[in-house]
Amino acid sequence: MIYLDHAATTPVPKAVADAMYTVLTEQYANPNAQYPFGQEMRRSVEDWRAVIAKAVGCEANQLFFTSCGTEGDNWAIRAACWQNRHVGRHIVTTAVEHHAVLNCCQQLEQEGWEVTTILPDQNGDISAESVLAAVRPDTALVSVMMVNNELGSIYPIADIAKGLKAVNEKTLLHTDAVQGFLKVPFSAKALGADFIAISGHKIGAPKGIGALYIGPRVRNPRPLLPGGGQEMGLRSGTEATAQIAGFAKAVELRWDHLEDKLHHMAEVKAYAVEKLSAIPDLHIIGDGKAPHVLSVSMAGWPSQNVVNDLGSQGICISAGSACHHGKSSQVVSALGLPKRVAAGVIRLSFGPETTFAEIDACAEALRNHHDHRMPML
């Protein structure tokens, strides 16, 4: 099998699975128990939190475990709106956000909030100036993703954070960094965002674990889940210790020689652009700078047909984010692409393990699809 869908999820290394297995079978105590077995697990949880916090660039007591990026996004948006409900009921976001953000904002619109949505340019880029121009005295929150999951576009979060200080210092800033964490270098302290959501399964950790950074400007954040008071009183529920252990181990593995891994992914992406650009009717979509995401379109050939054909050959690529119930995604729609191009968008995404030979095989399969299948659009 050739796996080129790392933006959807990633393989779990054996060392991560082993770390989880040890917790499941030997270190299974509840970390809230008061006897030594439980307190040992509490120390382990805090050690693992510190590992992840170091990679985020924050203090351990600023990082809260969640079940996924979607939970972190929703928690951040709701917490920001709660804190700033007296500032106003206006939110600024973009048309290319993950549905976790867009659908949460739609819910808030139904509750009486006003949402201003910024459109990208033809390459999928969002400028800090366009975001800041939409901020008003009553803007409670700005939510802009760090890296677009379909285009690989990197958005100027640090510039937005700096600009907000001059435009409206009360406005809080949230960024969905699920596709940015350990793929685009950043430090929470330098970035300046008030909320940063990350997810484990995009970097080799298991599904079901993520984290939310909450910065110092967030005063007395509203608890996500009332209950037993876990996660410093903000997210109750017994901690998923095995998933946390796996998350920390995955961070350690990815952090080791990270610069080399990012360089390799960037080289693989550049090689893919070169190989795929030689295929007739194939268009590179956007000019995203993230090293692991590449969207292309074989204009005239429906994306799901391409995905199915390559899948039957053991090559995993995605039309999922670029095709939603047979329609172009909000990201593709926002680019204003011709219909034939938009309907043919597919995504390839890479990991540290991706090889040039795998790109060769994918390119050959795509060329064969083009040469032997009639266009349908």
Each language-model region and where it sits:
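Pyridoxal 5′-phosphate
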Residues: 1-377
